[in-house]
Amino acid sequence: MAKKSSSRLPKRKGEYTYRGKTVSELQELSLEEFAELLPSRERRSIKRGFTDGQKKVLHEFKEGKKIRTHHRDMIILPEMIGIAIEVHNGKEFVNVELQPEMIGHRFGEFAPTRSRVNHGSAGVGATRSSKFVPLK
């Protein structure tokens, strides 16, 4: 009996591509040409232009400085691939290593703002039935 390959997990063959273009091809494109490959929301955001804060982040990136930012709405561009940045999640800065799969997404998608709550067990007297549970 032959083994079935898992159809849920996509097989990775070779280099990562975004809309049919490799990372090196994407890095050679101008910003306007790259914007045409993006989904409409990101494309419109880039065509409107970057904010002053986003321009500062791009400038720091080009100088090779360590990037710590509150600009969670900044779109990840192909030229940013391979660097580590720190994105603020509302409480602290979260380390994010930019990988090719992240192209076209925003910084904030990789720094979650909410953490899962782990409630403890209820105390004695918290419910009516727990009044009759003997203490240790």
Swiss-Prot record:
Listed InterPro entries: Ribosomal_uS19, Ribosomal_uS19_CS, Ribosomal_uS19_euk/arc, Ribosomal_uS19_SF
Biological-process GO terms, alphabetical: ribosomal small subunit assembly; translation
GO cellular component labels: cytosolic small ribosomal subunit
Keywords: Ribonucleoprotein, Ribosomal protein, RNA-binding, rRNA-binding
GO molecular function annotation: rRNA binding; structural constituent of ribosome
Keyword Iron: no
TM segment ranges: none
Superkingdom of the organism of origin: Archaea
UniProt key word rRNA-binding: yes
Role summary: Protein S19 forms a complex with S13 that binds strongly to the 16S ribosomal RNA.
Similarity-based family: Belongs to the universal ribosomal protein uS19 family.
PANTHER family: RIBOSOMAL PROTEIN S19P FAMILY MEMBER, SMALL RIBOSOMAL SUBUNIT PROTEIN US19
UniProt xrefs under NCBIfam families: PRK04038.1, uS19_arch
Name this polypeptide is given: Small ribosomal subunit protein uS19
Organism of origin: Methanosarcina mazei (strain ATCC BAA-159 / DSM 3647 / Goe1 / Go1 / JCM 11833 / OCM 88) (Methanosarcina frisia)
Taxonomic placement: Archaea, Methanobacteriati, Methanobacteriota, Stenosarchaea group, Methanomicrobia
Gene: rps19
